[in-house]
């Protein structure tokens, strides 16, 4: 109910300008962050841990953190930020797609729309400048039957980004909890899958 406080809180986890966000915009930003972090905060580290142990997982996190801090298309970080973003794109290419598929399964386990997650992922997974960011966001949008992404301001500059998903219904604060539940379910599925693979190998 406290929109200024919500804007301030979400500003700590997103790169876009939040000062003028509506309540719907704040909710969208939070849901998008949950979806994207399911990939680069959970699935990717687990995958790299499985492949190369702690050293590879830590290397991945260093690349991902560098992209988060510097990978914006503004004049100050244009060249260094571009290199960080490209490295992150390569590192997340496979994990993001695995995360999207696991999100579809997680949608089924949490009472959300697995069919919607699959269909919107297939349709909108390329609706982003990054080859990876829309992977889990599209699965999340489809699972919730809401529309994510769209135009946003970064450092005062307007970016006409495409939308992801269909606005079957308006997004609401409860969708943040729904997205979190799917992220937790996806994490458990990934952990179980990793343990099975580890046991086989």
What are these regions (language model features)?
Residues 1-59, 63, 71-201:
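Hydrophobic alpha-helical transmembrane segments
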């Amino acid at each position: 109910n406290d929109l200024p406080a919500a804007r301030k809180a979400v500003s700590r986890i997103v790169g876009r300008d939040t000062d003028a966000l509506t309540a719907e915009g704040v909710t969208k930003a939070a849901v998008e962050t949950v979806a994207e972090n399911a990939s680069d905060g959970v699935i990717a580290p687990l995958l790299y841990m499985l492949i190369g142990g702690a050293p590879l997982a830590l290397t991945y996190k260093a690349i991902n953190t560098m992209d988060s801090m510097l990978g914006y298309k503004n004049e100050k970080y244009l060249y260094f930020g571009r290199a960080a973003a490209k490295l992150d794109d390569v590192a997340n290419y496979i994990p993001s797609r695995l995360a999207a598929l696991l999100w579809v399964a997680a949608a089924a386990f949490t009472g959300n729309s697995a069919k919607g997650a699959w269909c919107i992922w297939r349709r909108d997974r390329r609706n982003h400048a990054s080859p990876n960011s829309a992977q889990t966001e599209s699965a999340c949008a489809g699972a919730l039957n809401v529309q994510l992404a769209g135009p946003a301001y970064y450092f005062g500059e307007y970016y006409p980004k495409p939308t992801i998903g269909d606005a079957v219904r308006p997004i609401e604060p409860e969708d943040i909890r729904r997205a979190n539940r799917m992220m937790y379910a996806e994490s458990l599925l990934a952990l179980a899958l990793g343990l099975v693979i580890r046991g086989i190998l």
